[in-house]
């Protein structure tokens, strides 16, 4: 039984507590079946979501005890944002009906994994063509390579802004740990696409694409399994996964609107700059080839296929000049830089005044959230813990007297009483 002190209506996370003897180390919850009570809750959630047009599709256990995941079917960005808000409201409401509490805080319990969102983002034309579909021969797909390198340029140029879009007080407890992507923005492409980019940079031309091949299981009785040419790399904050990018930094309580506004706008800028070059070109094929190579070379530093959790990557990112923005307070200024203001005003997304207003609101929200947590901790300590400790000191004092009267050494009890009394004095001075 987990025993922690929590006031969800105040902070959404535990402020004091102790780890139970067993946490998530056995992975038995992650790989286990959904418990009947949770399955009943999820069934009702699905029904309520389907009623209002949210296509909830899958649900499964996650790593931490009592942690679960839900995934809807893809939709256009503005609709998906609304759907996500409805999902969060529905989860909370249905949980109460089942006698449970749905915690959407990014780190509700210390010592076990927190929660986040995976924002699966792609670009599709009005006639249904996915611009991020590499096809079977990515090295020959000029349209895909141009779109890909434009995205690399956008993410490299505006990494600070993309990091800011996922800034949240709760995310400060989660990002960079071995459960979530690091606070350093990088792009994972997978072996196949990274090889194509390397060919473009080293030789000026991509002539082939790596194939996935077959996965050798070592068991003769099993059929051969097709091996994908790429991978998911869950340590990456912005990973290419087949025909889309997966932005994994968004906090579990946050709206996905900010992340998608930033992604759409920075990529629109990269597209616009590419258009300015290509529309003036006399030889379009030569110009697009040179532009793809130029963008690949200029933005290669943002590509990283390795372990984002490792300390080696932090040092490598610093060597590459990539920003490592560790907290929300450090991230907010990115919203009001001259670069950001120019970007958003150019495309009519936000004015300078609107950006400054949003930055001010975020500063205020952060300060209030931290202040509420601090005041709640003080309130809990004064009204719950200190009275309980004082009561315990009386019990210890009575025990010391009783043991001494029995003619037995009471030094252990006396020493414990003295230590607790000293702690109480420090607490009194701090108050």
Regions found by a protein language model. Give the residues of each.
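Conserved small/polar residues in nucleotide/adenosyl-binding loops
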Residues: 2-8, 426-430
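Conserved oxyanion/phosphate-binding beta-strand-loop segments in alpha/beta enzyme cores
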Residues: 7-15, 42-63
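Residues forming anionic-ligand binding surfaces in small-molecule and nucleic-acid pockets
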Residues: 10-29, 60-70, 249
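Helical (often loop-to-helix) elements that flank the catalytic cores of nucleotide-handling enzymes
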Residues: 11-13, 79-96, 123-155, 257-262, ...
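Accessory "access/gating" subregions that flank catalytic or transport cores
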Residues: 24-54, 70-75, 92-96, 100
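Acidic, glycine-enriched catalytic cores built around paired aspartates
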Residues: 41, 48-51, 94, 109, ...
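A short glycine-rich, hydrophobically flanked beta-strand micro-motif that places a catalytic Asp/Glu
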Residues: 58-59, 101-109
């Amino acid at each position: 039984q987990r025993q922690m002190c929590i006031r969800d209506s105040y902070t959404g996370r535990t402020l004091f507590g102790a780890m139970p003897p067993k946490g998530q180390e056995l992975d038995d919850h992650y790989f286990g079946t959904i418990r009947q009570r949770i399955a009943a809750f999820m069934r009702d959630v699905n029904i309520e979501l389907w009623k209002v047009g949210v296509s909830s599709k899958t649900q499964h256990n996650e790593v931490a005890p009592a942690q679960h995941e839900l995934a809807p079917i893809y939709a256009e960005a503005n609709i998906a944002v609304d759907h996500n808000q409805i999902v969060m409201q529905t989860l909370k409401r249905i949980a109460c009906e089942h006698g449970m509490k749905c915690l959407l805080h990014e780190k509700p319990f210390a010592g076990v994994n927190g929660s986040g969102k995976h924002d699966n983002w792609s670009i599709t034309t009005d006639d249904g063509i996915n611009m991020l579909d590499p096809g079977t021969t990515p090295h020959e797909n000029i349209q895909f390579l141009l779109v890909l390198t434009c995205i690399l340029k956008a993410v490299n140029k505006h990494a600070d802004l993309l990091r800011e879009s996922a800034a949240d007080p709760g995310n400060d407890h989660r990002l960079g740990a071995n459960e979530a992507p690091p606070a350093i923005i990088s792009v994972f492409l997978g072996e196949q696409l990274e090889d194509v980019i390397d060919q473009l940079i080293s030789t000026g031309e991509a002539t082939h694409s790596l194939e996935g091949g077959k996965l050798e299981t070592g068991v003769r009785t099993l059929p051969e399994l097709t091996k994908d040419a790429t991978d998911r790399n869950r340590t990456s904050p912005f990973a290419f996964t087949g025909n889309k990018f997966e932005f994994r930094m968004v906090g579990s309580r946050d709206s996905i609107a900010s992340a998608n506004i930033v992604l759409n706008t920075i990529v629109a800028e990269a597209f616009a700059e590419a258009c300015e070059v290509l529309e003036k070109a006399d030889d379009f094929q030569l110009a697009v080839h040179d532009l793809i190579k130029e963008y690949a070379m200029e933005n290669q530093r943002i590509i990283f296929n390795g372990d984002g959790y490792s300390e080696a990557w932090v040092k490598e990112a610093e060597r590459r000049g990539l920003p490592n923005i560790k907290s929300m307070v450090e991230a907010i200024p990115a919203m009001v830089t001259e670069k950001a203001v120019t970007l958003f005003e150019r495309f009519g997304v936000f004015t300078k005044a609107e950006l400054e207003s949003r930055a001010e609101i975020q500063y205020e929200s952060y300060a209030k959230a931290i202040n509420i947590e601090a005041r709640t901790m003080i309130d809990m300590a004064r009204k719950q813990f200190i009275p309980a400790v004082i009561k315990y000191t009386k019990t210890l004092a009575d025990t010391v007297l009783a043991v001494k009267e029995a003619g037995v050494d009471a030094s252990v009890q006396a020493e414990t009483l003295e230590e607790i009394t000293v702690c109480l004095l420090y607490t009194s001075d701090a108050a």
